Amino acid sequence: MAKKVVALIKLALQAGKANPAPPVGPALGQHGVNIMAFCKEYNSRTQDKAGFVIPVEISVFEDRSFSFITKTPPASVLITKAAGIAKGSGESAKGSAGSISTSQLEEIAKTKLPDLNCSSIESAMKVIEGTAKNMGVSIKD
């Protein structure tokens, strides 16, 4: 018989840098989860993705054990890294914050495909292109 899930916690943490300080400690502590065990396991799973923010979904079971799934970095983070900018434009309709090539767009779409609700690279590219345009990042051929 499967264990009963009592809580689902979603956090976005720096890869390889989870520690018991907020937001991790309070989020897990209120459900009675071993915080250090989570931090060690998360850091070991994400150490190869240093520099990225990695979203994580933690399932807490009734016996206070847990399991978690790491996701791919947010599209906005991948776009800003590819464009070489600190952040997107505050007014995307007026000014451009930077640009990325279609090959970079395709690479980001391939990275994000498992987490997107689409099945083909072409549709994933359209989703990522929309995110880029909202950030004021243009797509160059």
UniProtKB/Swiss-Prot annotation:
Cited Pfam families: Ribosomal_L11, Ribosomal_L11_N
GO molecular function terms noted in the UniProt entry: large ribosomal subunit rRNA binding; structural constituent of ribosome
Keyword Hydrolase attached: no
Disulfide bonds: none
PTM annotation: One or more lysine residues are methylated.
Biological processes annotated in GO: translation
One GO cellular component term noted in the UniProt record for this chain: cytosolic large ribosomal subunit
CDD domains per record: Ribosomal_L11
Swiss-Prot/TrEMBL keywords: Methylation, Ribonucleoprotein, Ribosomal protein, RNA-binding, rRNA-binding
Domain of life: Bacteria
NCBIfam families: L11_bact
UniProt family annotation: Belongs to the universal ribosomal protein uL11 family.
Function, as annotated: Forms part of the ribosomal stalk which helps the ribosome interact with GTP-bound translation factors.
Subunit organization: Part of the ribosomal stalk of the 50S ribosomal subunit. Interacts with L10 and the large rRNA to form the base of the stalk. L10 forms an elongated spine to which L12 dimers bind in a sequential fashion forming a multimeric L10(L12)X complex.
Identification of the protein by name: Large ribosomal subunit protein uL11
Gene: rplK
